[in-house]
Amino acid sequence: MANLQQQKIRIRLKAFDHRLLDTSCEKIVDTAKRTSASAVGPIPLPTRRRIYCVLRSPHVDKDSREHFETRTHRRIIDIYQPSPKTIDALMKLDLPAGVDIEVKL
């Protein structure tokens, strides 16, 4: 009864390239399991599509338009019972520049 709320680290990852995101998730989960912490995930969240509509011509032809889109892929990883060794290993982990990482304790 003493430890009702167990310690948890929640890691949110965002990237435009899903392959980079998946390899980063694998690295994080492997690091957590090597340091004897239990990892849940990666849990895929809905992908955000942002569509931009641009006129093709600089002057006339309003009917001629072009659409561009960016897709933001997101994942969540929960790490339960992290030791100081786990936190240190996660801080030293080298991840690609195209992946945005947000960590909550």
Swiss-Prot record:
It comes from the Bacteria. SMART domains: Ribosomal_S10. One of its GO terms (biological process) is translation. Disulfide bonds: none annotated. InterPro entries: Ribosomal_uS10, Ribosomal_uS10_CS, Ribosomal_uS10_dom, Ribosomal_uS10_dom_sf. Keywords: Ribonucleoprotein, Ribosomal protein. One of its GO terms (molecular function) is tRNA binding. One of its GO terms (cellular component) is ribonucleoprotein complex. NCBIfam families: PRK00596.1, rpsJ_bact. Part of the 30S ribosomal subunit. Belongs to the universal ribosomal protein uS10 family. Involved in the binding of tRNA to the ribosomes. This is Small ribosomal subunit protein uS10. It comes from Cyanothece sp. (strain PCC 7425 / ATCC 29141). The gene is rpsJ.
